[in-house]
Regions:
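N-terminal loops that bind phosphate or other acidic moieties
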Residues: 1-232
């Protein structure tokens, strides 16, 4: 296990990478959300993670799990609508699994706790056309890759990203069952879910950061999200 300083550095690097990616993808996420939502998902996600990244200096002396917890707190305060408590509250809840350090085992526990809290708060299941459609296959794949297939974390995370990509693709042909999109009923069919898409973007940046800090290598011809990008 890497020392605390290295783990903190990796968490902060991941935060900055995620914030930059969501800023880059703001318009695309807005376009997706304009079709089936309030057209604010891109702005909300950019604002929340950018505010968290701006607090980097405040996090410099914290343990990694405390950094993650404080990111969650910042998201609750700065991400509008229901997304703030959904993302931020779930991150805060799951951060306790990282107390004592970030390892393959604790990262699995974090992912499972995060997924469970997202499902509990949002009431969504697979097939609801939400971020859960990306999270469930990603978390299950990551857990299996670590615990059953005995893969190194970097390879396991790469497989989880691929699983999330398939989950995002799955949201397009199904009807929304939760959130504002559900009010559209069958008119929501044919549109990719923005929450699942931003989840994939976040996971891609976690993988990119992990490649800088973990031993090993993964083959990626392109970002997984390139395969799900749609012109709305």
């Amino acid at each position: 296990m890497a020392d605390v300083d290295t783990q903190r550095e990796a968490v902060l690097a991941a935060l900055e990478n995620v914030a930059a990616r969501l800023s880059e993808e703001r318009k695309y996420l807005t376009d997706l959300d304009s079709a089936i939502g309030d057209a604010d998902h891109g702005a909300n996600m950019e604002r929340g993670f950018s505010k968290a990244a701006e607090k980097r200096d405040d996090f410099d002396e914290m343990d990694p799990h405390e950094v993650v917890k404080n990111v969650g707190t910042t998201l609750i305060s700065n991400v509008g609508g229901a997304s703030g408590p959904l993302y931020g509250g779930s991150i805060m809840f799951a951060s306790q699994e990282l107390d004592g350090g970030i390892t393959a085992e604790t990262s699995v526990a974090f992912a499972e706790a995060y997924l469970d809290k997202v499902k509990d708060r949002g009431g969504a299941q697979v097939g609801s056309k939400t971020m859960v459609d990306a999270l469930v296959p990603a978390v299950h794949t990551y857990k299996k890759s670590i615990e059953q297939d005995d893969l190194p974390p970097l390879e396991a995370l790469a497989k989880a990203v691929d699983a999330a990509k398939r989950g995002v693709q799955f949201t397009t042909p199904i009807k929304a069952m939760k959130g504002r999109a559900s009010f559209l009923d069958w008119r929501s069919v044919g549109h990719q879910d923005p929450g699942a898409t931003s989840t994939l973007f976040i996971m891609e940046e976690l993988l990119a950061t992990a490649e800088e800090y973990l031993e090993g290598d993964v083959e990626r011809d392109a970002r997984a999200s390139d395969a799900v990008r749609r012109d709305e």
